[in-house]
């Protein structure tokens, strides 16, 4: 059983100073300025002295077809010298003059007491005479350029579009891994990672993650020596690599010569690669034009972009000089401050042991 739509009462106070309509004549005979038309569960029609709060005051010069438009509310009235018709339902077979509403703050007498009230004032021009037939047939298709008549009527077409939309496959990706990763993050990193995840939709976020891992880091695995400019297969360069490994080692006992079968040791740790990956995924506008690069044991930079307070563990720590724009590896450990610097068109992330100004 369909539930009937709730009907709200509308109060229209017709002000016809010339007394050319039935409303104006009744008000004049009763020595009152207004004629009230109440539309709701019941219909009332009477002359009144003043409008009620939240009522519509319709000022008309004479007979006409008026349509009051107040947001979603539409009230259609036919005012003639001998009759009145009004409705809040659809009434499309006649032409109407659209009348806009202006809310006003006023003081009116209501139930014998002067109160502050809001009324809605609208003024008609009488340019549309009552009962002028609307020549537009809703069932007739007009001749429009580039438009052809459909084989469906409007209801069937809407239902067809709705069924197609509901039957279309929806890609739903549920990722649990990122939430598991956030359990092992520091509080500030987990908050930043969560905000970045909310800004990027699910499917787009996965694509960005794959792109960051494949393109930005170029399939880098922990343990690979990034000092490519210094790498050579000659015996002299092997001795230099061996001395550099001794400098970077935390343990003084790791002074043995590296054999040809072993991979060369490096200061780039797995934790560092993971932390940098998460920073790149944040898509900071200050870094968008720069490509990611790994720092060497020592080197230079062009400018300091920003310094962030982040707690990182088991990462290479650097001492960098802002005046000479040089940095140098000190050890592998924990830090609470990270510097973002640029070299040419590359972004380098340095964990700060301390710095010289």
From Swiss-Prot:
Pfam families: BTV_NS2 (PF04514). GO terms for molecular function: RNA binding. The keyword RNA-binding applies. SUPFAM superfamilies: BTV NS2-like ssRNA-binding domain (SSF110132). Keywords: RNA-binding. InterPro entries: BTV_NS2, NS2_N. The keyword Methyltransferase does not apply. It comes from the Viruses. Residues 163-199, 228-267 are annotated as: Disordered. Single-stranded RNA-binding protein. Belongs to the orbivirus non-structural protein NS2 family. This is Non-structural protein NS2. It comes from Bluetongue virus 10.
């Amino acid at each position: 059983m369909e539930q009937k739509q709730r009907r709200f009462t509308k109060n229209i106070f017709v002000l016809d100073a010339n007394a050319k309509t039935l409303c104006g004549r009744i008000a004049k005979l009763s020595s009152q300025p207004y004629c009230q038309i109440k539309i709701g569960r019941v219909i009332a029609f009477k002359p009144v002295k003043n409008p009620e709060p939240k009522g519509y005051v319709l000022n008309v010069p004479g007979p006409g077809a008026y349509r009051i438009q107040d947001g979603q509310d539409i009230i259609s009235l036919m005012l003639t010298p001998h009759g009145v018709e009004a409705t809040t339902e659809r009434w499309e077979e006649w032409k109407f003059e659209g009348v806009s509403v202006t809310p006003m703050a006023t003081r009116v007498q209501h139930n014998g007491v002067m109160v502050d009230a809001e009324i809605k004032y609208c003024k008609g021009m009488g340019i549309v005479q009552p009962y002028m037939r609307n020549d537009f047939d809703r069932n007739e298709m007009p001749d429009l350029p580039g438009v052809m008549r459909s084989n469906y009527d409007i209801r069937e077409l809407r239902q067809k579009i709705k069924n197609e939309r509901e039957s279309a496959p929806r890609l739903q990706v549920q990722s649990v891994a990122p939430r598991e990763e956030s359990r092992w993050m520091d509080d500030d990193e987990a908050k930043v990672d969560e905000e970045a995840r909310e800004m990027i939709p699910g499917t787009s976020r996965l694509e960005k993650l794959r792109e960051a891992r494949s393109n930005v880091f170029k399939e880098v695995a922990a343990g690979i020596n990034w000092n490519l400019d210094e790498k050579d297969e000659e015996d002299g360069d092997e001795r230099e690599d061996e001395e550099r490994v001794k400098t970077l080692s935390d343990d003084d006992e790791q002074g043995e010569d590296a054999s040809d079968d072993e991979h060369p040791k490096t200061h780039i740790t797995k934790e560092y690669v993971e932390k940098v990956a998460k920073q790149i995924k944040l898509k900071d506008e200050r870094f968008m034009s720069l490509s990611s690069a790994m720092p060497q044991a020592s080197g230079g930079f062009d400018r300091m972009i920003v310094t962030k307070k982040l707690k990182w563990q088991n990462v290479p720590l650097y001492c960098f000089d802002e005046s000479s724009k040089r940095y140098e590896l000190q050890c592998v450990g924990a830090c609470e401050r990270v510097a973002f610097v640029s070299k040419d068109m590359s972004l380098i992330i340095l964990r700060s042991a301390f710095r010289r100004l």
